[in-house]
UniProtKB/Swiss-Prot annotation:
The keyword Oxidoreductase does not apply. Residues 650-763 form the Calponin-homology (CH) domain. May play a role in the organization of the cytoskeleton. Residues 386-396, 440-466 have a biased composition (Basic and acidic residues). Residues 1-46, 324-409, 438-478, 573-633 are annotated as: Disordered. It holds the Pfam family CH. Disulfide bonds: none annotated. This is Leucine-rich repeat and calponin homology domain-containing protein 2. The lineage of its organism: Eukaryota, Metazoa, Chordata, Craniata, Vertebrata.
Length: 773
């Protein structure tokens, strides 16, 4: 109405318009309207009617009937300055009626005092003001659920906030907070927004917020996130944008996050455990110096990032040598179909100290031969088996003990019975030396510079013997093996004491035999002569009982004692008939034979049958790695014999590896790292060596790039196979050619050195002729 009247005159219209706008302000505006009207009358001259009209205030439109949005869906950027058209009194009055207090954008420095009852307020919006502290009137709002203090000048949060025990939403962003008090986390908060402050850390007490669903600490100066954030089991959204974070805690991988924003930080690696974030829908990671995953993968999006993390997790798991996707003996596994995107960022195998690959564990306990490769193992074992069968058919005198000792013989599958006799240490010494070497290998497995080639047959034995132990933790395994080694040391000492007592008793036995030989013939024919041999038989019983080690099974001991007693009885019957006719030399020899027969596990019938050809000095008995005669004969051998042989073998391998390093560095003019096995595993250096010997012998070489610093296993295998093919074409003989897994698994550096040496020894004329062809 005032606006229409204002249009009546030129100058008077301006006055009426001023009065109309002033009238909207309430009582103060009325004065403005009067003044405006007077101005209009003076200016218009004939328009006094316009100046005298009183402007009627127009009520506020229904747009502000809901001055405060429901719930925690506020977005400070969308707030409009339309609240300025309302009076404080009306806002406070509506807050008393509706429980929603909205004082946003009024530039208030203090909370306006009023006579309104605001104790039932459930939502309070005090954003965009100039409060330097949270108004004390707010602590009286006991049922308060939502508090918005966005864009003020608040520096601290007082302890009185604990009175708001129903507060679930708190927005105190864009203030001057430097710390968050511990008592803040005693509230049942579901949404906490503290962005754009000066926070340098988050208290560990944040783990108390079990119901927290959204946390925004962006645009602060936080350097480390506490591990207690892993206890926020209800957290859906986490915003840590624009801070000084270098590392993301692994505990976040266990949260049900839907949105994660850690952009504009200094994070270099996404933890592998983040692959467990199955509910994650949005991940924002731009403006970070990420190295893992590489940049080109991060640009492809969330799906590729999680693929990379899954592959990385598979590669970091402990791998057994037989579970690798590598070609094995006489059987090449088909290559897995990989897409280009997967192949580009398939990580390299992690041959760490825990993976069981490429480390010299010293697990060479039971093998007595050291074949060169897997082909030699299978061939040698077949020949040994056929020889044993033929020997068992020809030499029937040893068949009686074969079933009882079959279990003991399984660990000596690689021993040829027709080979010449060599010094075989005692059983206790063999096991002790092997376990000591195994323990030393376990303790030094973390030093990758001592990686040496392990003969494949020893790995084959270890897979059968230690498969249950490899599944346990390394610390428990080493502890158990130390206990076993200690028990074997004690057993070995007992065996030596028994052997010493046996030798003493044997000397006494010989002295007794000599005394009996000096007895006259008529006294030997007297009926008392068997009684004279009775103490000797008792002594022999004691000797035989002492010679059996305590580690033998009870059934074996009883069987052998029964057989030895039967042999002794028949022997004394036989000797009593020939005692007068036999000479001193024969008697001494028979005494020794009786002593040896008491030790050999054969029956009496077999003893009679074999007496014709094995009665002599027992030199024609078949060789067996576990025969007691061999152990008794070589009982005095040096217990460190096996250890010395192993150390000599390791020294030879180190020398060959050093020669391999010298050959590569001198030819290629490069400096290889200390871990030469890892340097050669991708096949790049070896392919360059082949091209150095003859250009273009390897047509294509897969090399790492800055974006993908490690080649995939498929590309490594391709390089290695190309190198071996080039060696064949250049003329390297098959017996000097290594296998692919010697390079890929870092287990055959000696074989690789032989191949490289053979490649370097090729005559230049032959290589040139091949290139001409």
């Amino acid at each position: 109405m005032a606006a229409s009247q204002g249009g009546g005159g030129n100058s008077g219209g301006g006055g009426c318009s001023g009065g109309g706008s002033g009238g909207g302000g309430g009582a103060a505006g009325g004065g403005g309207g009067g003044g405006g009207g007077g101005g209009g009358g003076a200016g218009a001259g004939g328009g006094g009617g316009c100046g005298g009209t009183v402007a009627v205030p127009i009520p506020v439109p229904t747009l502000f009937g809901q001055p405060f949005p429901n719930g925690p869906q506020w977005h400070p950027g969308s707030l409009q300055p339309q609240h300025t058209v309302r009076s404080l009194d009306r806002a406070l009055e509506e807050a008393g009626n509706s429980g929603i207090l909205s004082l946003s954008g009024r530039k208030l420095r203090e909370f306006p005092g009023s006579g309104y009852d605001l104790t039932d307020t459930t939502q309070a919006d005090l954003s965009r003001n100039r409060f330097t502290e949270i108004p004390s009137d707010v602590w009286l709002f006991a049922p308060l659920e939502t508090l918005n203090l966005y864009h003020n000048c608040i520096k601290t949060i007082p302890e009185a906030i604990k009175n708001l025990q129903m507060l679930t939403y708190l927005n105190i962003s864009r203030n001057l907070l430097s710390t968050l008090p511990k008592y803040l986390f005693d509230l049942p908060l579901k949404v906490l927004v503290v962005s754009n402050n000066k926070l340098v850390s988050i208290p560990e007490e944040i783990g108390k917020l079990k119901d927290l669903m959204e946390l925004d600490v962006s645009c602060n100066e936080i350097q480390v996130l506490p591990q207690q954030m892993g206890k926020l089991h209800s957290l859906k959204e986490l915003n840590i944008r624009r801070n000084n974070l270098h590392v993301l805690p692994d505990e976040l991988g266990d949260l049900p996050l839907v949105k994660l924003d850690f952009s504009c930080n200094k994070v270099t690696e996404i933890p592998v455990c983040y692959r467990k974030l199955h509910h994650l829908q949005v991940i924002i990671l731009d403006n970070n110096p990420l190295q893992v995953p590489p940049a080109q993968i991060c640009l492809k999006g969330k799906v590729h990032i999680f693929k990379y993390l899954n592959i990385q997790a598979c590669c970091r798991m402990d791998k057994k040598p037989d579970s690798l996707d590598l070609p094995s003996l006489n059987k090449r596994m088909p290559s897995q179909p990989l897409t280009d995107s997967m192949e580009d960022f398939y990580p390299n195998k992690n041959h760490g100290p825990d993976s069981g690959i490429g480390s010299d564990n010293g697990e060479k306990r039971l093998s007595t031969t050291e074949p060169s490769d897997d082909d030699t193992i299978s061939l040698h074992s077949q020949v040994s088996e056929s020889n044993r069968e033929q020997t068992s058919r020809n030499d029937s005198h040893i068949t009686g003990s074969k079933p009882d000792s079959q279990k003991d013989q399984e660990v000596y599958d690689f021993i040829d019975p027709n080979t010449e006799d060599v010094a075989v240490p005692e059983e206790g010494d063999t096991h002790i030396g092997s376990f000591v070497s195994f323990l030393k290998g376990k303790e030094k497995s973390s030093e990758k510079s001592q990686k040496n080639e392990e003969p494949p047959n020893e790995k084959k034995v270890d897979k059968e013997q230690l498969l249950p132990e490899e599944e346990d933790d390394d610390l428990k395994e080493v502890t158990d093996l130390r206990k076993i080694a200690a028990q074997l040391l004690k057993q070995e000492q007992k065996n030596r004491i028994l052997n010493h007592s046996t030798s003493v008793m044997r000397n006494k036995l010989k002295q007794t035999v000599e005394c009996e030989k000096s007895v006259p013939a008529d006294e030997g024919n007297s009926p008392l002569s068997p009684l004279a041999w009775q103490p000797l038989e008792n002594q022999k019983d004691q000797i035989v009982d002492q010679q059996w080690p305590e580690s033998q099974p009870i059934i074996w001991q009883n069987e052998e004692r029964r057989r030895s007693k039967q042999i002794r009885k028949e022997y004394f019957k036989y000797k009593s008939t020939r005692k007068n006719s036999s000479g001193n030399e024969n008697e001494e020899q028979e005494s020794d034979n009786a002593h040896m027969s008491a030790q050999s596990p054969v029956s009496s019938e077999e003893y009679d049958r074999s007496d014709g050809f094995s009665h002599g000095p027992f030199g024609l008995k078949p060789r067996s790695a576990f025969s007691r005669a061999s152990r008794q004969e070589y009982g005095a051998a040096d217990p460190g014999f096996t250890m010395r042989r192993k150390m000599e073998h390791l020294r030879e391998e180190r020398e060959q590896i050093r020669q391999l390093r010298n050959n590569l560095e001198s030819r290629l003019k490069v400096i290889l790292p200390d871990d030469i096995g890892a340097a050669l595993m991708d096949g790049v250096v070896l392919c360059h060596l082949a091209n150095h010997i003859r250009p273009r012998s390897v047509a294509s070489i897969h090399v790492p790039s800055p974006a993908v610093p490690k080649l995939s296993m498929a590309k490594c295998r391709r390089n290695v196979e190309n190198f071996l093919d080039a060696c064949k074409k250049l003329g390297v003989s098959q017996e000097r050619l290594c296998l692919p897994h010697h390079i890929l698994e870092e287990r055959g550096l000696v074989k690789v050195g032989v191949t490289v040496q053979a490649l370097l020894e090729l005559p230049t004329t032959k290589a040139s002729q091949l290139s001409m062809a």
